[in-house]
Amino acid sequence: ALTGRRPSVVYLHAAQCTGCSEALLRTTKPFR
């Protein structure tokens, strides 16, 4: 997944899917 080949694509995807990005952030750093 994180091959580091095209981070720009991942960044764009995250930007398009803000919800997914938030979910990932919550998974890594849950606001509890």
UniProtKB/Swiss-Prot annotation:
Compartments, as annotated in UniProt: Periplasm
Cofactor binding annotation: Binds 1 [3Fe-4S] cluster. Binds 2 [4Fe-4S] clusters.
Binding site for [4Fe-4S] cluster: 17, 20
Origin superkingdom: Bacteria
Major enzyme class: oxidoreductase
Cofactors, names only: [3Fe-4S] cluster; [4Fe-4S] cluster
EC number from the UniProt entry: 1.12.2.1
Catalytic reaction(s) noted: 2 Fe(III)-[cytochrome c3] + H2 = 2 Fe(II)-[cytochrome c3] + 2 H(+)
Keywords carried by this UniProt record: 3Fe-4S, 4Fe-4S, Iron, Iron-sulfur, Metal-binding, Oxidoreductase, Periplasm
Subunit record text: Heterodimer of a large and a small subunit.
Name of protein: Periplasmic [NiFe] hydrogenase small subunit
Gene: hydA
